[in-house]
UniProtKB/Swiss-Prot annotation:
Biased composition (Basic and acidic residues): 245-261
Cellular component, GO, one term: GINS complex
Keyword Nucleus (UniProt): yes
UniProt-recorded name of the protein: DNA replication complex GINS protein psf2
Taxonomic source organism: Emericella nidulans (strain FGSC A4 / ATCC 38163 / CBS 112.46 / NRRL 194 / M139) (Aspergillus nidulans)
Family, per entry: Belongs to the GINS2/PSF2 family.
Entry function: The GINS complex plays an essential role in the initiation of DNA replication. Has a role in chromosome segregation.
Pfam families: PSF2_N (PF25005), Sld5 (PF05916)
Acidic residues bias spans: 262-272
BP term (GO), one: double-strand break repair via break-induced replication
Amino acid sequence: MAFPLPRGITPPEISFLAEMELVTIVPRQRLEGLELLGGPVAPLIPPRRTNVPLWLALLLKRQRRANILPPPWLHPESLSLILDIETRDQAYQHAFSPPPPLPGQPSLRERSYKKSTARPRFTPEGTKYYATPPFLPQNVAQDQAFDAFESEPPTLPFHWLEVGTMLLDAAADDLVDPDQTRRLLKELREVRSAKIRSGVEVLDDAAGPGGGVALTGVGAMEIGEGRGFISGVVDGLRRIGASKEQARREQLADATNREYDDMQDYNDEMEF
């Protein structure tokens, strides 16, 4: 007997999609350019930095043919700042730290006075499209990244949990203080998971009008892991709400019948 397929995308499938994220490497050996489905990869010439898909970077790292430069957010200082936002900032006690802006959107500090509009891209045939993760450079290394913290706080990309876990497993020697990085990632995951669980409490309004949970800033793996739990809660609340609505309608019908009977008795007495 075959088990039913899980609803939605599974965690292994999410990790597979995260391997398409672009990361920065420093090649140790020369390698000719590659033509991939996601686009061409420039020839690898040491020590020139190159952005390649994560799966290719992990392959070259295992073969000791390249080193991976961690993205700015995967630094202990960046993760500590994000953890402070998640736990100490009153504006985010029941919300998640803001995600990085999409192409064409203003930065976090500019959103108060600039209109948020995404900038489209175009295919070679001229078709317009809007790029989304994993096809955005949210995990590439940047020069002078920490100087930018003074003007722009660090943010977690959409595939932060998957990318961080894979880099810690395969390229821990390329990260700054991997033990502390692993601990901060674990704390962030626990804090954000607790927010998701606590946010489900407001889903009791799903039985009535206007219920919902804001998921702005939630990562792909967090959505995949919480989908089954949240869906089960919503289904249960919907059934409870349906039974409550049925009971309310029955009470309303009984009250209407009693009023009709009382009025009928009154009319009978008046006729008598």
